[in-house]
Regions:
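HhH-family (HhH-GPD) DNA N-glycosylase catalytic core used in base-excision repair
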Residues: 2-486
Length: 486
């Protein structure tokens, strides 16, 4: 229970829900106001600011006239700003920025909770389900999130539902009633009230504000997405890796380098999906960010939020390349590599259990498992014909050997790789599975659990690369220098 800190002295104040002393408070406010004044997009998603005279909250890079310092308030999350009565700016759309990289880096209960909320756990299982996954009471989780972020799990999930609803309203022609329930709202009335409170507009007005050409006519056409990223993004090495690892029937990478299309099947809580992601950059914002274009086909629209979050983890879109490049670029051995590939990512996975089995079995064996035990899609799409077999199916079908042992451990919960799993506990549980060695456990920790600071066992990796050793290894591999470095 050491993750939970006791309340500090009364002399402390709050900034973004984080307790701090008066001097640190003023310094933090000054630095954040400077980021707002200079419209520094590097801080988009790291914090939000609200203007008391207008009732609007924005991202730091908002192009609107900079408000007076005395009228500005700062928040750690969009949910905290919404909870204080502020509405999203229609000009900079602060709800659409990449999430804070902290939630992927942090291994404490707040980071784990934010990853689970992003995966839709609160919508599916409620606060009690979230707390149970974290191993704490609902009251403890509420208190910790509110203390650090200025918003509890319900408010954080509400902000996420609002964003999902806006995406569906502005990119599809689905009836508003369907969108309400697909976004996770319990009723149309709750949906209407929330949209009006968050965006100062009715759902119909929000839809009318988007160009009609941006909306797809039917669910079969898929949902067009702009998967935003912070700072520079090196799509080439990510797609190279996806192409090398692609398992036939489940994944496909097609097209020439620089214009490749990655497609894969998805097993989701309510149904299945197929996603296509374009390698070509979709655009930039002042040279400091942009997006990847994607199209998502779902059998159940309630899976939209979860599917998007899993794609973001696969492509490592919420990373902070500025922090990573600054630390690694200070090392003489890595500086030329960082200069050559600024914003290089450490890819994750769209399905942690699937990745763990594949990492242990290898590509050829994984393809055999798919063809023999994978579930055939009701509507195959070209070469995408199957879902990767679930752990329970593999454990029953092939109980012998290392992949079967791992599948059994995943199926019975002995090994947990969900977004809220404790990384240290998961690695120890993996090492207890017969046939799983330290190298496999390390790659699963880096890719399936999204740990940014993993070094292969026995590798001569300096501590000065912490907390970004996973990214350092990505640079060495992309440059073809990993074998020499080892």
């Amino acid at each position: 229970m050491s993750d939970f800190r006791q309340p500090g002295p009364r002399a402390w104040r709050r900034l973004d829900g984080v307790k701090t002393d008066d001097v640190a408070l003023e310094k933090a406010r000054d630095s954040r106001y400077e980021a707002v004044r200079s419209r520094d997009a590097r801080f988009d998603g790291a914090f939000f600011f609200a203007v008391e005279t207008t009732g609007i909250y924005c991202r730091p890079s908002c192009p609107a006239v900079t408000p007076k310092r005395s009228n500005v308030r700062f928040f750690a999350t969009a949910a905290a700003a919404q909870g204080s009565g502020f509405r999203a700016c229609r000009r900079c759309r602060p709800d659409a920025v990449p999430g804070s990289a902290d939630w992927n880096v942090r291994a404490d209960v707040v980071g784990r909770a934010m990853r689970l909320i992003g995966d839709g756990v609160v919508d599916r299982e409620g606060v009690a389900g979230l707390a149970g996954r974290l191993g704490y009471s609902a009251r403890q989780v509420q208190r910790q999130l509110t203390a650090e972020l200025g918003a509890g799990p319900v408010a954080l999930a509400r902000a996420q539902r609002s964003h999902t609803a806006r995406v569906l309203l502005q990119t599809t022609a689905l009836p508003v009633t369907e969108i309400a329930f697909a976004s996770g709202f319990a009723s149309v009335r709750q949906f209407n009230e929330t949209i009006r409170a968050v965006y100062a507009a009715t759902p119909s007005e929000l839809r009318a504000a988007a160009p009609a050409r941006s909306r797809t006519g039917a669910p079969s056409a898929g949902i067009p997405l702009r998967l935003a990223h912070r700072g520079p993004y090196q799509a080439g090495p990510v797609f190279d890796l996806l192409q090398r690892e692609a398992v036939a029937g489940v994944e496909e990478v097609s097209g020439p380098t620089g214009r490749r299309l990655y497609r894969r099947t998805l097993r989701l809580p309510y149904g299945t999906g197929i996603v296509a992601v374009d390698e070509r950059p979709g655009g930039t914002r002042n040279g400091s960010g942009g997006w990847l274009d994607a199209r998502l086909h779902l059998t159940d629209l309630r899976d939209l939020t979860t599917a998007v979050q899993r794609l973001r983890r696969l492509l490592d879109l919420d990373a902070d390349p500025y922090a990573v490049d600054e630390r690694l670029g200070a090392d003489p051995r890595l500086a030329p590599l960082v200069d050559a590939r600024p914003g290089l990512r450490s890819p994750g996975t769209a399905d942690p259990d699937e990745f763990a089995v594949r990492a242990l079995a290898g590509r050829a064996e994984a393809e055999r498992l798919v063809q023999r035990y994978g579930k055939t899609l009701d509507a195959p799409c070209g070469t995408l014909t199957h879902l990767f077999p679930e752990p329970g199916v593999l454990a029953e079908a092939e109980p012998y050997g290392a992949p079967g042992a791992l599948a059994a451990a995943l199926a019975d919960g002995a090994v947990r790789l969900d977004p809220g799993a404790d990384r240290g506990d998961a690695e120890r549980a993996l090492l207890a599975v017969p046939g799983v060695d330290a190298a496999t456990a390390a790659v699963v920790r880096a890719r399936a659990l999204g740990d940014p600071d993993v070094a292969p066992p026995g590798a001569a990796v300096p501590d000065t690369w912490r907390p970004w050793r996973s990214y350092a290894l990505s640079h060495l591999r992309a440059a073809g220098e990993w074998e020499n470095h080892r």
